[in-house]
């Protein structure tokens, strides 16, 4: 049995790279348990507006996210025209503050809106009770996509041109597999039955 680390001796980051031939992590009648530590929290929302071109973001919650982590910032526009954007963190999170290596291409809403006697506002009206709901939350979601254990295929011509990536295959009724908190990159093999991530 292969044991990479235990709770007493954790590792910071593990990268499992599949070879260029089979590109598979195969379990035949055995046991595979992968428990990665997920970032905390896994997702939150913006805590303030973010303009197009912004590299600094304010979140609504404190995180333990690290430099190099990949985050996804969801759209917040009413018409659904903006796409989710992937950013790479330039530094460890500082409280609720993030700084990224790349910039947002579209603005994101990041403030709560409150029902008031004059309509929706960014601050509640003291003493005004419109019934429910009183708060509209359209803040953009922000998720951390990085995990400390990564299973990935090679970034070569076979992947780029043919979709030939890594896969995890579990065979036999006696096999036991638990995968939790693991990131998969360049996985799946296009056009091959049973070669899914």
Predicted feature residues:
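Beta-strand/loop edge motif enriched in small/polar residues
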Residues: 1-197
């Amino acid at each position: 049995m292969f044991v990479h680390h235990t709770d007493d001796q954790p590792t910071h980051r593990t990268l499992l790279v599949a070879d260029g031939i089979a590109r598979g992590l195969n379990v035949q009648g055995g046991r595979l348990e992968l428990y990665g530590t997920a970032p905390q929290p896994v997702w939150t929302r913006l805590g303030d507006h973010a303009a197009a071109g912004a590299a600094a973001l304010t979140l609504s919650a404190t995180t333990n996210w690290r430099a190099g982590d990949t985050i996804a910032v969801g759209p917040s526009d009413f018409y659904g025209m903006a796409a989710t954007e992937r950013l790479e963190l330039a530094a460890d999170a500082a409280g609720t503050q993030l700084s990224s290596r790349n910039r947002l291409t579209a603005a994101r809403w990041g403030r709560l809106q409150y029902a008031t006697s004059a309509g929706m506002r960014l601050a509640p009206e003291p003493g005004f009770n419109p019934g429910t709901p009183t708060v509209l939350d359209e803040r953009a979601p922000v998720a951390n996509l990085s995990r400390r254990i990564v299973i990935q295929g090679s970034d070569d011509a076979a992947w780029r041109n043919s979709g030939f990536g890594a896969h995890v295959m579990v065979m036999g009724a006696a096999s036991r597999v638990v995968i939790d908190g693991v990131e998969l990159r360049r996985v799946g093999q296009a056009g091959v039955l049973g070669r899914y991530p």
